[in-house]
């Protein structure tokens, strides 16, 4: 497994792979890897000849400096996990390598609408940072496919739109959420939970599933469903942050023409902001 930290060396390797006619898959990450990331790697390996995993804690997508400062950096452990998975190449650049003149004056990519709605409304600049770094990685790695987790549902929708709008010749693969046995979606942010909070955390998925059951049973008073869900979260020990029920294909509000709904939930548990989602077919 090659570990590359600079752009010239990365370009050199990508040119070699292209000359050899290899099919390349990219798995972009911020490190602190868990089994959910490994599922992305496995999906990439099944679809390509060569797998490139990027590990970069992107300062442009953090709306709070304290979140950036405390985000776990575990490069050595991450590389050991990826090596066991037989990943071909890890790209782990420094911030200086990606943003030599800082982020303030760096050219950015923005996806209108999707970047400022829902999660984007509560985290200004977050999705602009995501679309900028992902487009930069696409340009550098030139992958045939790229794998992203469905846990970050809005992010996946944003990347799909960016790829379509910008004409990237890349297949975007959404990989289903990986959960612990108790239902909690795997996330790097779960590491912020205390032992006691970890016992409470599966309640998020229980509330999410309760909303899904109501929708599948034909209930359509969305305001009431959301209000009850928020109350249930608070009673379980969470601080409900945002609950949305949207058209899964457009992320707009549910209409009579909507065929699928996505339930998007965000809640604080101690210092961890947990997100999860679930799709529901509408009768």
Curated annotation (Swiss-Prot):
Pfam families: Pantoate_ligase. ATP binds at residues 30-37, 149-152, 186-189. CDD domains: PanC. Gene3D superfamilies: HUPs, Pantoate-beta-alanine ligase, C-terminal domain. It catalyses: (R)-pantoate + beta-alanine + ATP = (R)-pantothenate + AMP + diphosphate + H(+). GO terms for biological process: pantothenate biosynthetic process. Keywords: ATP-binding, Cytoplasm, Ligase, Nucleotide-binding, Pantothenate biosynthesis. It is an enzyme of class 6 (ligase). (R)-pantoate binds at residues 61, 155. Beta-alanine binds at residue 61. Pathway: Cofactor biosynthesis; (R)-pantothenate biosynthesis; (R)-pantothenate from (R)-pantoate and beta-alanine: step 1/1. It is found in: Cytoplasm. Its EC number is 6.3.2.1. One of its GO terms (molecular function) is ATP binding. The active site is at residue 37. GO terms for cellular component: cytosol. The keyword Phosphoprotein does not apply. The reaction proceeds by a bi uni uni bi ping pong mechanism. Catalyzes the condensation of pantoate with beta-alanine in an ATP-dependent reaction via a pantoyl-adenylate intermediate. HAMAP family: PanC. Homodimer. Belongs to the pantothenate synthetase family. This is Pantothenate synthetase.
């Amino acid at each position: 497994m090659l570990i590359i930290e600079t752009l010239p060396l990365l370009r050199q390797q990508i040119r070699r792979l292209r000359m050899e006619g290899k099919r390349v898959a990219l798995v972009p990450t911020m490190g602190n890897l868990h089994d959910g990331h490994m599922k992305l790697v496995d999906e990439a390996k099944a679809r390509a000849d060569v797998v490139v995993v990027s590990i970069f804690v992107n300062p442009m997508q953090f709306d709070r400096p304290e979140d950036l400062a405390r985000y776990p950096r575990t490069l050595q452990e991450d590389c050991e996990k990826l090596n066991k998975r037989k990943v071909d190449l890890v790209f782990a650049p420094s911030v200086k390598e990606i943003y030599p003149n800082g982020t303030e004056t760096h050219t950015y990519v923005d996806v209108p609408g999707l970047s400022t709605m829902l999660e984007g409304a509560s985290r200004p600049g977050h999705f602009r940072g995501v679309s900028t770094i992902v487009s930069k990685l696409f340009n550098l790695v030139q992958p045939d496919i790229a794998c992203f987790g469905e846990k970050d549902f809005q992010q996946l929708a944003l990347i799909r739109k960016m790829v379509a709008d910008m004409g990237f010749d890349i297949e975007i693969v959404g990989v289903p959420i990986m959960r612990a046995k108790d239902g909690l979606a795997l996330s790097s942010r779960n590491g912020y939970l205390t032992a006691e909070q970890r016992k409470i955390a599966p309640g998020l998925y229980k509330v999410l599933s309760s909303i899904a059951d109501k929708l599948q049973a034909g209930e359509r008073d969305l305001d009431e469903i959301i209000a009850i869900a928020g109350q249930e979260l608070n009673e379980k020990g969470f601080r409900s942050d945002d609950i949305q029920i949207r058209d899964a294909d457009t992320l707009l509000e549910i209409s009579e023409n909507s065929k699928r709904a996505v339930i998007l939930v965000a809640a604080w548990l101690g210092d961890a902001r947990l997100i999860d989602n679930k799709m529901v077919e509408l009768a």
